[in-house]
Regions:
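Flexible loop/hinge segments that line or gate small-molecule binding clefts
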Residues: 127-167, 187, 248, 274-286
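Flexible loop/turn connectors
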Residues: 230-329
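Hydrophobic alpha-helical segments within soluble ligand-binding/sensing domains
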Residues: 157-182, 222-230, 250, 291-309
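N-terminal helix-turn-helix DNA-binding module of bacterial transcription factors
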Residues: 1-64
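Amphipathic helical "hinge" segments at domain boundaries
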Residues: 48-115, 119-120, 198-201
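An alpha-beta-alpha
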Residues: 166-211, 313-328
Length: 329
């Protein structure tokens, strides 16, 4: 039995009538080459049925086809769906994905970043509140952030949080609400969520209403959040509309409201934020502002790949939101 010959780079070069270096440059897209030369090399590869060694090419290009995702938690439906969408898109492009959930703990997040960077990832997509972490300032790898500001030179993919805030509050005003409260993260966190609160305050002031915001920490238990919401109902029994910072908190508010004999939509109207698929499935009655999670994932991957390819003029992107009308407002 005749052993099948292994086709090498030299064979492609000989058939194409070019040097081995030229074939290597075509494979790795390095340096200027004429279209005629590139076609000759590809024609030779096709004729010889030559398949490049992918691992060797990655080493030559100093790429691992490995990316990392760092988010606060997958317990939140928004981040759970976002991570799933990102992983799906990277898988389609031949990238492996490492994931770390920081629980919004700066020390844990820094440990994750060091670990992931030691794995020689090509780039990272993050969704962190922790702006002061040194790895973000050093920026030794391409980084794209989603819905969070982590560094001046790091592009952010976000939804139009200001417009989302306006839509939510205007809906409550249109429903006849006179006393509208907003729940949000603590104001010391640098996040596009601040734009939702700004929109709430601007619209309330425009209508000569007093804006009231209750801060709810991101990383506390549901029981602790419910304690905050009970305090809110006790301190403001007149509340008739609530713009919640996310759908999970909106659902908790509705549950706590029942303890105070406040039922949606008759005694209380609630608008959430995020509109993740799992929330729409489990709580279809929730009126909410839907973020375009699949589109945000697509854009984040696109920007990261541009950075990995060496582009330096990658800009932040803001995507539109929409109102999902249901029965809680």
């Amino acid at each position: 039995m005749v052993e099948k010959k292994t086709i090498k780079l030299d064979d492609v070069a000989e058939l194409a009538g070019v040097s081995k270096t030229t074939v290597s440059r075509v494979l790795n897209n390095r340096g200027y080459l004429s279209d005629k030369t590139i076609k000759k090399v590809h024609d030779a590869m096709d004729k010889l049925n030559y398949r490049p060694n992918v691992i060797a090419r990655q080493l030559f290009k100093q790429k691992t086809n490995l990316v990392a995702l760092v988010f606060p938690t997958v317990d939140n439906p928004f981040f759970a769906e976002l991570e799933a969408e990102l992983e799906k898109r990277f898988d389609q492009l031949g990238y492996r994905v490492l994931m770390g959930n920081s629980q919004n703990n700066p020390a844990k997040e820094q440990d994750y970043l060091k670990l992931l960077l030691n794995h020689q990832v090509d780039g990272l997509i993050v969704g962190s509140h922790n702006q002061g972490i040194s790895e973000y300032q050093k920026k030794t790898r391409p980084i794209v952030s989603i819905e969070r500001f982590v560094g001046k030179q790091i592009p952010v993919v976000s939804s139009d949080n200001y417009q989302g805030g306006l839509l939510a509050v205007q809906r409550l005003l249109n429903d006849g609400c006179k006393h509208i409260i907003h729940t949000n993260y603590p104001i010391n966190l640098v996040s596009p969520n601040e734009l939702r609160q700004q929109a709430y305050e601007d619209l309330m002031n425009r209508h000569h209403r007093k804006p009231i915001t209750y801060s709810v920490s991101f990383d506390v238990s549901d029981e602790e959040k419910e304690r905050v919401f009970r305090k809110m109902f006790r301190e403001h029994p007149e509340v008739d509309g609530i713009f919640a910072d996310n759908d999970t908190n909106a659902s908790l508010i509705i549950r706590v409201g029942k303890e105070f004999n406040r039922h949606v939509p008759d005694d209380l109207k609630v608008v959430g934020y995020d509109g993740a698929n799992i929330t729409r499935t489990l709580s279809p009655e929730l009126t909410t502002i839907q973020q375009p999670i699949p589109e945000m994932a697509t854009k984040a991957v696109e920007l990261l790949l541009q950075l990995i390819d060496g582009k330096t003029d990658v800009k932040s992107v803001t995507l539109p939101v929409k109102m999902i009308n249901s029965t809680t407002a």
